[in-house]
């Protein structure tokens, strides 16, 4: 592991009770600062499971995960949460914006959870929303935004804590082709301009091909494309 390594997993395995076959079987991956990594695979191949393990949202059956040089297994749940919130951002296929809050408030929530003042959190959220092209939608509720705008707000929420790496699970899965390309353009621009590493799980081979490194998850293992 180099000083620039943000995420690393070694011989990662995951099995579930009642299943004879490992969902993940001996996966090793290193994510360095500023990298772009795409992971493709069929539905049920374990792509989301791998992303959850990398993000410390689930525990492996065997193997290890390190974030910023720290083994997740050696940390308490509270310590894992603190490290996760400091180093990682998450974007999902479903935006998970809270319908009762404005776009601005939704993006500010991670900062408020970290006990920043409301004014400071809203100020930072406004800056990030402007970066993703939603400066004119600050006071709109999620239901008043288009699908692409909601996903841009979700990207802004992932970025508001200044993460070193964004883990994106099918971030364009519910979008039409044109809107999906726009969201992907946004992620790549943020990677280029801010040096945020990207690990993107997607079923879209055309979008995956735009990333620096591409892997296919098949039979529990990662294969370089």
Swiss-Prot record:
Give the record's family classification: Belongs to the ABC transporter superfamily. Lipoprotein translocase (TC 3.A.1.125) family.
Domain named ABC transporter: residues: 7-225
**Subcellular localization(s) per the UniProt record:** Cell inner membrane
- Any one Gene Ontology BP term: lipoprotein localization to outer membrane
InterPro entries for this protein: AAA+_ATPase (IPR003593), ABC_transporter-like_ATP-bd (IPR003439), ABC_transporter-like_CS (IPR017871), ABC_transpr_LolD-like (IPR015854), LolD_lipo_ATP-bd (IPR011924), MacB-like_ATP-bd (IPR017911), P-loop_NTPase (IPR027417)
Per UniProt, what is the name of the gene that codes for the protein in this document?
Answer: lolD
Q: Which GO terms describe its molecular function?
A: ATP binding; ATP hydrolysis activity; transmembrane transporter activity
Query: One Gene Ontology cellular component annotation?
Result: plasma membrane
List ligand-binding residues for ATP. 41-48
The answer on whether this UniProt entry bears the keyword Translocase reads yes
Assembly mode: The complex is composed of two ATP-binding proteins (LolD) and two transmembrane proteins (LolC and LolE).
Bilayer topology reads: Peripheral membrane protein
User: Which keywords annotate this record?
Assistant: ATP-binding, Cell inner membrane, Cell membrane, Membrane, Nucleotide-binding, Translocase, Transport
Q: What's the chief localization of this chain? A: membrane
Organism taxonomic ancestry: Bacteria, Pseudomonadati, Pseudomonadota, Betaproteobacteria, Nitrosomonadales
Q: What does this protein do?
A: Part of the ABC transporter complex LolCDE involved in the translocation of mature outer membrane-directed lipoproteins, from the inner membrane to the periplasmic chaperone, LolA. Responsible for the formation of the LolA-lipoprotein complex in an ATP-dependent manner.
Q: What is this protein called?
A: Lipoprotein-releasing system ATP-binding protein LolD
Pfam families referenced in this protein's UniProt entry, alphabetically: ABC_tran
Q: Where are the transmembrane segments?
A: none
Query: EC number(s) of the enzyme?
Result: 7.6.2.-
